[in-house]
Swiss-Prot record:
It comes from the Eukaryota. ATP binds at residues 559-566. The keyword Kinase does not apply. It comes from Dictyostelium discoideum. This is ABC transporter B family member 4. The chain crosses the membrane at residues 208-228, 252-272, 324-344, 350-370, 429-449. GO terms for biological process: oligopeptide export from mitochondrion; sorocarp morphogenesis.
């Protein structure tokens, strides 16, 4: 069960002359029960009734709650020890009296004075323990907290939830019983750290059976292949002894046919399983990318992320396929070959085995080095991919500035670094394979020399030596395949490490947590908001911002470029979490609300709308996938887009091109407005929606925007101040705060920052 605490000072209280009181008390927030018991959930308080002293948490008890911003804004009990004189009637020595206060302030102080009369240590312990239990049971999320360092020193502003003069009250509001809350979810979206090994089994799913049967079939193929050298040895001995060759020849034919069939089966099963696995892995990785917060994409380039989806997954798929199809068979041939060699000639086998420890040691030494080198090479390759993606994605800009040579040089520079690392990796692989080949050839020479010696002594037959040599050659081939496969596996492990890191990354903003509201009115409040971008942690974009938008109100933001206007729009959609303060919608903190649900209730039209390289119809349906054709046409008409769409030869089936390049700016804007209308949001954000249009297009777009804004809370961000004159209220941003706030006429008469901005733009237009 969750509960929401709201602490509010109902009447503005002048505390200009109470510096000593503030310095003495220095509260971050004081939450105290009113004498009006109807404002308190009595059932909650009765649970913590002290039966021995018959005390309640009431006006004689203080609950001090600290808003800890470093702990996800959850409340913690601040264990301060407030005490007063043992004589409750003696108020002469009370440090909070101020002779200069008027009668109203004296009455205010007496209430605080009486509140701190805690006579016994038992009462203090009762307060601390009781408060801790309350907030443990009710798992408080966030409330409106007055902190001394976050409010005006002279005036504490009221919050109009309950109209009781001069009272500080607590409202314990059980969110689970709130009729406006229709769903609450604490799901973590299954985002848990998982090893690469577990990720494999989770991703391959039911295809693990197909994968397993493929492995078993590969082992059978290896076992069948081990019979071939034995049959060839028998054929040689039969020739020498004059025996019939028909039986061994037929046996050899059946063995070869069986091996071919088994090779087909295991290769097909493993290939199908690996292709399905790579498709699921790519989907899982892409899903993990989409769940990340916007700050993650600010810190990671598009090219690098695309490289993980393509190159890294391809490396893993290829290595997995070859490691099973070739690796399992080669491993089976090596193990079976060793057993067969021992059965044929223990002496010759013992001599050959002396070199195997050297081969294993060399392979182990190179394993870690090749893996780290592979990771570095893949990252360098990703950098060259980034340059290529940027250049091709902005090819019109590149060609407009005739910078093809410059972009080519950038790509060559990044590619050279990737080439150097790839070359180093190739050299190391060559060394490894050369050493492996030397070891295997040494084994072959040993077999030929010592085997011939044993045949001359009569300890082996010619057929046995032939069988032994064929087994040795098969083992040599298997070792060569494993050495090549080993380097592929090391590269794949580097790619898998990058994939697993991203899948395991827990987004800083979980879009699936929080509750949804049955009805969204659209009241928005920014309360003492501080914000810094993750990529610029030392730059304060917003600093103590306070802003209120009432339901259905149109509020415009003006100010110089880079002042934080678009940042406010991003924070409202919770693309980022604020550093300090709070943002509330209909009285609920934005951190409590389900982010996906919230964004589905917000429509945005930006200066450069993002359209997908598909049809106009599909772009419109992005606002509402379930919209009917009639609803789409009606939305297009309201956005003044239906006429120009109908004039296209293919109408709504017209392809708009990548990012809508085949449409004009005004056409893209009107499609974006129609898309927002289909979304039917309660809150609208217009981020410089008409600043890049000509006067004729602006008139059409502005008419469409007027249709969109009807009855909806609207936040308008504009550089051209002529577009915001009709707004209900205008806020002027300066140094991360609202410096001026009012309608157009009020701000012009004030002749402050807004007046200067208007005059500056008028003079620029005249010039």
């Amino acid at each position: 069960m969750n509960s929401l605490l709201r602490c509010c000072l109902i009447k503005p209280i002048n505390i200009k002359n109470t510096t000593s009181f503030i310095n003495k008390l220095n509260p971050k927030s004081i939450i105290q029960k009113s004498n009006n018991y109807n404002n308190i959930n009595k059932n909650i308080l009765n649970k913590f009734k002290d039966s021995s002293s018959n005390y309640f948490i009431n006006s004689n008890k203080i609950l001090e709650i600290c808003n800890n911003n470093n702990n996800n804004n959850k409340y913690n009990v601040n264990k301060r020890n407030y005490s007063s004189s043992s004589n409750s009637g003696n108020n002469n020595n009370n440090n909070y009296n101020n002779k200069n206060n008027n009668n109203n302030n004296e009455s205010f102080y007496k209430k605080f004075e009486n509140s701190f009369e805690i006579k016994r240590i038992k009462d203090i312990l009762f307060i601390i323990v009781g408060t801790f239990v309350i907030f443990k049971i009710y798992d408080n999320k966030i409330g409106i907290v007055f902190c001394e360092n976050e409010i005006d020193k002279e005036t504490i502003l009221n919050d109009p939830y309950d109209k009781i003069p001069n009272e500080i009250i607590v409202e314990l509001k059980d969110s689970a019983k709130d009729d406006n809350i229709i769903e609450e979810s604490d799901e973590d979206d299954g985002i848990k750290k998982i090893s690469s090994f577990k990720l494999f089994f989770k991703t391959i799913g039911n295809d693990i059976w197909l994968f397993g049967f493929g492995i078993i079939t590969a082992f059978f193929s290896s076992w069948v292949g081990l019979q071939i050298p034995k049959v060839f040895g028998v054929l040689i001995d039969c020739t020498k002894n004059g025996d019939s060759l028909q039986g061994p020849a037929i046996q050899a034919i059946f063995i070869l046919l069986a091996q071919a069939g088994l090779n087909f089966l295991y290769s097909t099963m493993i290939s199908v399983a690996c292709e399905r696995y790579s498709a699921r892995l790519r989907s899982t990785l892409f899903g993990a990318m989409l769940e990340q917060e916007i700050g993650f994409f600010d810190q990671n380039s598009t090219g690098d992320l695309i490289n993980r989806l393509s190159s890294d997954v391809q490396l893993v798929r290829s290595a997995l396929k070859h490691s099973v199809s070739l690796g399992v068979k080669s491993f089976g041939q090596i193990v079976g070959g060793v057993i067969s060699l021992i059965l044929i000639s223990p002496k010759l086998s013992l001599g050959m085995m002396t070199i195997l420890p050297t081969m294993v040691s060399v392979g182990t030494f190179y394993a870690g080095w090749l893996k780290s080198l592979s990771v570095r090479s893949q990252r360098a390759q990703a950098q060259s991919t980034i340059v290529a993606e940027e250049a091709i994605g902005n090819i019109r800009t590149v060609q407009a500035f005739s910078n093809q040579h410059y972009e080519s040089e950038r790509f060559i520079e990044k590619n050279q670094h990737s080439l150097a690392l790839s070359t180093e990796s190739g050299v190391q692989i060559g060394i490894f394979q050369g050493v492996t080949s030397l070891a295997l050839n040494s084994v072959s020479l040993l077999v030929y020399w010592y085997g011939g010696t044993l045949v001359s002594r009569g300890e082996m037959t010619g057929g046995q030596l032939t069988s032994f040599i064929i087994h040795t050659m098969n083992m040599q081939s298997s070792f060569s395949q494993l050495s090549i496969l080993f380097t592929q596996i090391m590269s794949a492990m580097g790619g898998m490490q990058r994939i697993t890191e991203l899948i395991n990354r827990v987004p800083l903003i979980n879009s699936n947590q929080g509750f949804k509201l049955r009805e969204l009115k659209g009241e928005i409040k920014f309360i003492n908001v501080d914000f810094k971008y993750p990529t610029r942690p030392h730059v304060h974009v917003l600093n103590g911002l306070n802003l209120t938008l009432k339901p259905g109100q149109v509020v415009a933001l003006a100010g110089s470029s880079g002042g934080g206007k678009s940042t406010i729009a991003g924070l409202l959609e919770r693309f980022y979490d604020i550093s300090n303060g709070d943002i509330t919608i209909d009285g609920y903190s934005i951190k409590q609300l389900n982010a996906k649900w919230l964004r589905s209730r917000i429509g945005i039209v930006s200066q450069e709308p993002s359209l997908f390289a598909t049809t106009i119809l599909e772009n419109l349906r992005y606002g509402n996938p379930n919209a009917t054709e009639d609803e789409i046409i009606e939305a297009a008409k309201l956005a003044n887009a239906h006429q120009f769409i109908s004039n296209f030869p293919k109408g709504y089936e017209t392809i708009v091109g990548e990012r809508g390049v085949q449409l004009s700016g005004g056409q893209k804007q009107r499609i974006a407005i129609a898309r927002a209308i289909l979304k039917n949001p309660q809150i609208i954000i217009l981020d410089e929606a008409t600043s890049a249009l000509d006067s004729q297009s602006e008139l059409l777009v502005q008419t469409a925007l007027d249709n969109l804004m009807k009855g909806r809370t609207t936040l308008v961000i504009a550089h051209r101040l002529s577009t915001v004159q009709n707004a209900d209220l205008i806020g002027v941003l300066s140094h991360g705060k609202i410096a001026e706030f009012g309608n157009h006429n009020e701000l012009m008469n004030h002749k402050g920052l807004y007046y200067k901005l208007v005059q500056r733009q008028l003079s620029q237009q005249q010039q």
